[in-house]
């Protein structure tokens, strides 16, 4: 697995949520690049800071009315495209 900074992990997860709102699908796709522990920790942090909200038991959504989606750095674009 490639090592990402904590900020890069957060950005990756936010953009992955935009691509896959279903939490189960999201976690399966992200497991190819991050550990499940990192994924869960970042999702919990994003929910706690209100950058992501849970809609029902299985759907995650970026809370773009509360905070803008961060710009995707060039080094992460191919990673998101390949998810």
Locate the predicted segments by residue:
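Short amphipathic alpha-helical interface segments
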Residues: 2-31, 83
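A short, conserved structural fragment
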Residues: 47-58
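Short, amphipathic alpha-helical interaction segments positioned at domain boundaries
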Residues: 66-83
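Minor-groove-contacting beta-hairpin "wing" of winged helix-turn-helix DNA-binding domains
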Residues: 58-67
């Amino acid at each position: 697995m490639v090592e990402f900074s904590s900020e890069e992990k957060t950005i990756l997860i936010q953009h992955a949520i935009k691509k896959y709102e279903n939490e189960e699908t999201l976690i399966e796709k992200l497991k190819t690049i991050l550990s499940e522990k990192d994924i869960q920790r970042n999702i919990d942090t994003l929910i706690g800071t209100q950058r992501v909200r849970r809609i029902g038991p299985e759907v995650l959504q970026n809370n773009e009315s509360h905070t803008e989606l961060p710009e995707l750095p060039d080094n992460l674009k191919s990673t998101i495209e390949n998810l």
